[in-house]
C-alpha cells in the first residue's frame, strides 16, 4: 500500500537546532528520529573530554562554527528498523528479478558447440536434439554473449554468439550475407519486454552493439562483466602489475626450456620427473600474491580460473577490410567467437561465487546494473566538434612548423659561411655539421643517388622523401630555437635527457637548489660522449632539466605542457618568440592531441538529429572497485586555452529532458575523517573531522588552508598534498611535489617543510606493545585507524563490508606488505560504497516517486541522471534524500547515530541541459567560441521552495516485506570489540599526546586513565 502525506517545511524554531559537544550542528529532531529512531545516542564523557583536549591542542576548540536553519522534511519510511536493513532490502529488491536468471547460468553444464553455424542473417537457435531455427532474438532471459566486429572498417557488429541454459545462438550481420550494402546493423535482444541477465567479458563492448540499448528508455537488461568481477576479486594494484608481468615472462621462459629438454628426453621415467618438477622461484617466496592474480584479458582470466588456454591467433582475421575473407572462413570465426563465450561462461561460474563471498552486500551487485547501463545523448554538433577541433589543431601545427622551418632553413645557410660560426655556438655546435664529399660521375656530374649533396648531416636527417620533417617534438628543435635554462644553453644527453650546462663556479649554487648534476662517469657512459667538446667537460657542469616525476626521470621534450610553468616563470627561455608560441600551441593542443584518437573512435549511433554513445565502462575496473572508462570518466573540464576541452558539453539532453546531478562534497576526505571521528563516537571529534565539517577558508580553519600555511603554497595546491597523504603517500611524495611547485626550493628546505607538514598532520611515530603508533598530529588517530584496518587479515570496508582483493590480503603478502595500497583501498573502496548506496537509493526513489529518469554517467564522486523536464525538481529532491540516507548509513555503521547537517545534503544539485562540471561554466575554448547558456544550481533550501516540491504529496513507502534481512554486526563494532573499553581509551590517550614527553608519560601511567 502507498501512503501519501504532506512532506516538508523549514523549521523556524531555534529549539530544533541541535549542537554536539564540540560545536557541530546535527540534524533537526524530526529528521534524526526518522533516520535513527527516538532513542538518544549514548555519549561517553571520557571520550568527549579527550576529543576536546585533542581539538584544543589543534587550536580548534571554541572556533567559530556555522549555524544554519534546521531542515525538517518528511522522508519516505525506512524499509526496516535500521539503515542497514533499509539498504539491504533496497538492494535485494532490485536484484530479485535477476536472481533466478543468475542461478540458471551458475548451474549450466557448459559444453562447446558440436555443430556448424548456419551462414544466414539474424539469429539462429541451436538447441540439443532439435533442428536449428531462425529466431528474432535469444528466447531465454539469461545467457553468455560475445560480439565480433571488422574494427578497421566499422564499429558495427558482423557476428555474435550467445549461450543460454537451453541453446546456443549465432547472429550474422545482413552485411556479411550480402543482403545489405551497409554495415550499420545492431543486434536485437528484446530487452524491453522481460528482465535479462547478459554476461560478457568487457561486456560494455558487446552492449554497444545491442539494438535496444540506443533508447532514452532504459532496458531491463543487467549486463554483467566478468572482467569487473575478476578485478574486484583477484585484481592487482598498480605497484604489483610490473612484478607480475616480470614473473610471468620468466615463468614462460622456464616452461619453454623444460619443454625443450623434455622433447629431447627419450626415457619415460625422466619425462614423468620433468612433468612433476616445479622450478623453484625466489620471486614467488617474496611475492606469494603472484599466484593469486592475472592480467584482465579473457585469455589470461580463463587460464587463471579454469586452466583454459584460448587460441587467439584467429582474431587477427577480424583486422581485415575485406568481408569476403570472413565469408570464406565463416564457421571457424563463429567457433572462435563461441569459444570465447564458452570461456566467459566457465569464468563466470568460478568468479561469481568468489565475488559474492568477498562482497556479500546486495547493494554492490545491484548498483552494477545501473553503472553498466549508462547512456550519453548527443547531437549532430558532435561531428562539427570533431571537424573544428581537428582543423584548428592542424592549422596551428602547420603555422608553428612553418616558422620553425624558416629558422631551420636560415640556420642551414651557415654551412656556406667560411668562418664556421656554429663552432662557437653552444646550441648549433651540438648538431652534426659534417658534409659528406660530393660524389661525381665520370663526366664530372653530381651522382644522382646522393641525398642532398653539400648539406650537413643534421639537416639531411630531417629530410624524408624530399620533405622537411621538423616539428616541436623533433630533437633538433630546442637547439634551433636556442632554448636555455636561466640563460644556460640546453644540451641533449641520450641517457639523461635534456640538460643545461653551467660554469663550474656556479655548480654549488645549483646543487643547493637540489638540481641533479650529471657526473663525469655518467657522461662517459653516454653513447654521445665523444661528441662533447673537451672545453665543455673542463669548464662546465651538466645539470638535468627538472622532471615532474622526480630526479630519476629524464625530460625528452621541452615543448610540452609539463614545461609550460618553467617558461611562464622565466626558467626556460629563448631568443625566439616562436619558442613560447610553439609551447603555448603544444599546451593548447595537449588535450586534443592526447584524446583525439579516443574521441574520434567513439561509437555514436544517430537517429535523425539525436545521437547516442554507450560509454565503454568497466563497472569495477580497479582493485578499489572504481568504474573505469578511458574517455568520459577522464574527460577534463572546459578551459579557455585548451582546444577540444569542451568535450563533455557535447553531451546534450534531448528536447524535453535535462541532466540532474551533484558532486559529493569532499567525499573521501569526509569518509577518512569519519573513520577517525568514530574513535570518539562524535562528529568533529578529531581535528581533521572538525576541519572537514566546520572549517572555512575565511577563518583559515579548513584542512586545505592549514596545509597551505604550513607549506607556503596556494590552497588549491594544498588539496593535492592532503589527498595524497590521506591515501597513504609519504614524505618523499610531498618533498618531490614541493619541488615541482617551486623548483627554487633546496633539497633541505623541501625536506624540512615536508617533515613539518607530516609532524603537524600524521604526527610522530612511537612504539607501544611492540607496535608502531602515530601520535601528536591532527590526523594521527585517522592513520592509526586506517593502518589497523589495512593490517587486518581480511580487511573490509567499514560500511558495506566489501573485502580486499586476494593479492592484497595479508596471507598472500611477504616482504612487501603494500601498506600504502591497502590504506588507499580502504578509503577509495569506501568511496565506491558511497556511490553504490547513492545509486540504489535513487533506483528505489525513482520508482517510488514515479520519476522518468535513468543514470547517465557517474565519475567517482559525481553522479548525473537524464530526467524528463517535468520531473527535474522531484529528481533533485530524490537525490537529496539519497545523499541523506547514504550519509546516515555511513554514520550508523561507524557507530555514530547522528548526521552533521553541514554534509547531510548536497551543497547543490545541478539542473542542466549539457554535461559540465559547473552550471555556470561557459565552455568557451579555442574550438568553441560561443558561450553555452547557464543551467541552474539549487541548494536544499532553494529546492524546498520550488512549487513542485513545496507542499507536494510524495509516496511514503513501497511494499518490500518479502525481502528477508540478515542482520550483521558493523565492521567497526567488531573491530573495536577486539580490545576492552579501558584499553581502547588508553590507546586514544597515547594518540592525542602532543609530544614525546607526554606520550612517554601516558605509556608509564598505563593503568590510570586521565581524560581531563
UniProtKB/Swiss-Prot annotation:
Its cofactor is Mg(2+). Keywords: DNA replication, DNA-binding, DNA-directed DNA polymerase, Magnesium, Mitochondrion, Nucleotidyltransferase, Transferase. It is an enzyme of class 2 (transferase). This is DNA polymerase gamma. It comes from the Eukaryota. Involved in the replication of mitochondrial DNA. GO terms for molecular function: 3'-5' exonuclease activity; DNA binding; DNA-directed DNA polymerase activity. InterPro entries: DNA-dir_DNA_pol_A_mt, DNA-dir_DNA_pol_A_palm_dom, DNA/RNA_pol_sf, DNApol_Exo, POLG_palm_dom, RNaseH-like_sf. In eukaryotes there are five DNA polymerases: alpha, beta, gamma, delta, and epsilon which are responsible for different reactions of DNA synthesis. Its EC number is 2.7.7.7.
Amino acid at each position: 500500500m502507498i501512503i501519501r502525506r504532506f512532506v516538508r517545511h523549514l523549521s523556524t524554531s531555534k529549539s530544533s537546532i541541535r549542537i554536539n559537544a564540540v560545536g557541530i550542528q546535527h540534524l533537526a529532531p524530526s529528521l534524526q528520529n526518522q533516520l535513527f529512531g527516538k532513542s538518544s545516542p549514548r555519549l561517553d564523557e571520557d571520550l568527549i573530554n579527550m576529543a576536546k583536549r585533542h581539538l584544543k591542542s589543534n587550536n580548534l576548540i571554541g572556533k567559530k562554527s556555522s549555524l544554519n536553519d534546521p531542515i525538517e522534511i518528511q522522508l519516505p519510511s525506512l524499509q526496516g528498523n535500521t539503515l542497514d536493513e533499509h539498504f539491504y532490502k533496497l538492494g535485494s529488491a532490485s536484484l530479485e528479478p535477476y536472481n533466478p536468471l543468475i542461478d540458471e547460468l551458475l548451474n549450466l553444464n557448459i559444453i562447446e558447440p558440436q555443430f556448424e553455424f548456419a551462414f544466414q542473417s539474424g539469429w539462429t537457435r541451436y538447441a540439443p536434439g532439435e533442428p536449428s531455427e531462425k529466431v528474432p532474438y535469444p528466447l531465454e532471459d539469461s545467457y553468455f554473449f560475445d560480439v565480433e566486429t571488422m574494427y578497421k572498417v566499422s564499429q558495427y557488429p558482423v557476428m555474435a554468439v550467445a549461450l543460454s541454459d537451453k541453446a546456443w545462438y549465432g547472429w550474422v550481420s545482413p552485411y556479411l550475407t550480402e543482403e545489405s550494402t551497409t554495415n550499420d546493423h545492431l543486434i536485437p535482444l528484446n530487452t524491453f519486454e522481460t528482465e535479462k541477465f547478459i554476461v560478457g567479458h568487457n561486456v560494455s563492448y558487446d552492449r554497444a552493439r545491442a539494438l535496444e540499448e540506443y533508447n532514452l528508455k532504459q532496458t531491463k537488461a543487467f549486463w554483467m562483466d566478468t572482467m569487473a568481477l575478476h578485478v574486484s576479486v583477484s585484481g592487482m594494484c598498480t605497484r604489483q602489475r610490473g612484478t607480475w608481468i616480470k614473473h610471468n615472462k620468466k615463468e614462460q621462459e622456464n616452461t619453454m626450456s623444460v619443454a625443450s629438454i623434455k622433447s629431447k628426453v627419450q626415457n619415460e621415467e625422466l619425462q614423468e620427473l620433468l612433468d612433476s618438477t616445479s622450478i623453484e622461484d625466489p620471486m614467488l617466496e617474496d611475492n606469494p600474491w603472484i599466484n593469486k592474480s592475472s592480467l584482465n584479458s579473457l585469455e589470461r582470466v580463463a587460464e587463471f580460473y579454469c586452466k583454459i588456454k584460448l587460441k587467439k591467433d584467429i582474431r587477427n582475421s577480424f583486422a581485415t577490410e575485406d568481408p569476403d575473407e570472413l565469408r570464406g572462413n565463416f564457421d571457424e570465426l563463429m567457433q572462435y567467437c563461441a569459444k570465447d563465450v564458452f570461456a566467459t561462461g566457465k569464468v563466470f561460474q568460478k568468479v561469481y561465487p568468489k565475488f559474492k563471498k568477498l562482497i556479500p552486500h546486495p547493494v554492490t551487485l545491484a548498483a552494477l546494473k545501473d553503472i553498466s547501463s549508462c547512456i550519453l545523448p548527443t547531437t549532430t554538433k558532435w561531428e562539427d566538434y570533431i571537424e573544428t577541433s581537428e582543423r584548428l589543431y592542424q592549422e596551428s601545427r602547420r603555422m608553428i612548423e612553418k616558422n620553425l622551418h624558416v629558422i631551420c632553413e636560415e640556420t642551414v645557410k651557415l654551412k656556406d659561411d667560411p668562418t664556421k660560426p656554429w663552432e662557437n655556438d653552444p646550441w648549433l655546435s651540438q648538431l652534426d655539421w659534417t658534409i659528406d664529399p660530393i660524389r661525381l660521375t665520370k663526366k664530372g656530374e653530381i651522382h644522382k643517388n646522393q641525398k642532398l649533396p653539400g648539406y650537413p648531416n643534421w639537416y639531411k636527417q630531417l629530410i624524408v622523401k624530399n620533405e622537411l620533417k621538423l616539428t616541436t617534438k623533433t630533437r633538433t628543435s630546442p637547439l634551433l630555437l636556442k632554448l636555455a635554462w636561466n640563460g644556460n644553453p640546453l644540451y641533449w644527453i641520450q641517457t639523461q635527457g635534456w640538460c643545461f650546462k653551467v660554469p663550474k663556479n656556479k655548480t654549488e649554487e645549483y646543487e643547493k637548489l637540489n638540481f641533479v648534476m650529471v657526473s663525469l662517469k655518467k657522461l662517459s657512459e653516454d653513447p654521445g660522449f665523444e661528441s662533447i667538446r673537451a672545453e665543455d667537460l673542463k669548464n662546465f657542469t651538466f645539470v638535468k632539466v627538472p622532471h615532474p616525476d622526480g630526479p630519476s626521470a629524464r625530460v625528452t621534450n621541452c615543448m610540452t605542457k609539463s614545461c609550460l610553468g618553467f617558461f611562464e616563470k622565466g626558467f626556460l627561455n629563448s631568443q625566439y618568440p616562436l619558442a613560447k608560441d610553439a609551447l603555448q600551441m603544444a599546451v593548447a593542443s595537449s588535450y586534443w592531441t592526447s584524446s583525439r584518437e579516443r574521441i574520434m573512435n567513439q561509437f555514436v549511433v544517430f537517429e535523425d538529429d539525436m545521437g547516442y554513445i554507450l560509454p565503454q565502462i568497466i563497472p569495477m575496473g580497479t582493485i578499489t572497485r572504481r568504474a573505469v572508462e578511458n574517455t568520459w570518466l577522464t574527460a577534463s573540464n572546459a578551459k579557455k586555452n585548451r582546444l577540444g576541452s569542451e568535450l563533455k558539453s557535447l553531451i546534450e539532453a534531448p528536447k524535453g529532458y535535462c541532466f540532474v546531478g551533484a558532486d559529493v562534497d569532499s567525499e573521501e576526505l569526509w569518509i577518512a575523517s569519519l573513520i577517525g571521528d568514530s574513535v570518539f563516537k562524535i562528529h568533529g571529534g578529531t581535528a581533521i573531522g572538525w576541519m572537514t565539517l566546520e572549517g572555512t577558508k575565511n577563518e583559515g580553519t579548513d584542512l586545505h588552508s592549514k596545509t597551505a600555511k604550513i607549506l607556503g603554497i596556494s590552497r588549491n595546491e594544498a588539496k593535492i598534498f592532503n589527498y595524497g597523504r590521506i591515501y597513504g603517500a609519504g614524505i618523499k611524495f610531498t618533498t618531490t611535489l614541493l619541488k615541482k611547485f617551486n623548483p627554487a626550493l633546496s633539497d633541505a628546505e623541501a625536506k624540512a617543510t615536508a617533515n613539518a607538514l607530516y609532524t603537524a598532520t600524521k604526527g610522530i611515530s612511537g612504539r607501544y606493545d611492540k607496535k608502531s603508533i602515530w601520535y601528536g598530529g591532527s590526523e594521527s588517530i585517522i592513520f592509526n585507524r586506517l593502518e589497523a584496518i589495512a593490517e587486518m587479515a581480511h580487511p573490509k570496508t567499514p560500511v558495506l563490508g566489501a573485502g580486499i582483493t586476494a593479492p592484497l590480503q595479508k596471507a598472500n603478502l611477504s616482504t612487501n606488505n603494500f601498506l600504502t595500497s591497502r590504506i588507499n583501498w580502504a578509503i577509495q573502496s569506501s568511496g565506491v560504497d558511497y556511490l553504490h548506496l547513492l545509486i540504489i537509493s535513487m533506483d528505489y526513489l525513482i520508482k517510488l516517486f514515479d520519476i522518468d529518469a535513468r543514470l547517465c554517467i557517474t565519475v567517482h564522486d559525481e553522479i548525473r541522471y537524464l530526467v524528463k523536464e517535468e520531473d527535474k525538481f522531484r529528481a533533485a529532491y530524490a537525490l537529496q534524500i539519497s545523499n541523506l540516507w547514504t550519509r546516515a548509513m555511513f554514520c550508523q555503521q561507524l557507530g555514530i547515530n547522528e548526521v552533521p547537517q553541514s554534509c547531510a545534503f548536497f551543497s547543490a544539485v545541478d539542473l542542466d541541459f549539457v554535461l559540465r562540471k559547473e552550471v555556470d561554466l561557459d565552455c568557451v575554448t579555442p574550438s568553441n567560441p560561443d558561450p553555452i547558456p547557464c543551467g541552474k544550481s539549487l541548494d536544499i533550501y532553494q529546492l524546498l521552495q520550488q512549487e513542485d516540491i513545496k507542499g507536494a504529496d510524495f509516496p511514503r513507502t513501497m511494499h518490500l516485506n518479502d525481502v528477508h534481512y540478515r542482520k550483521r554486526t558493523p565492521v567497526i563494532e567488531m573491530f573495536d570489540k577486539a580490545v576492552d573499553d579501558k584499553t581502547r581509551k588508553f590507546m586514544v590517550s597515547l594518540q592525542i599526546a602532543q609530544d614525546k614527553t607526554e606520550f612517554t608519560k601516558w605509556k608509564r601511567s598505563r593503568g590510570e586513565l586521565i581524560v581531563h
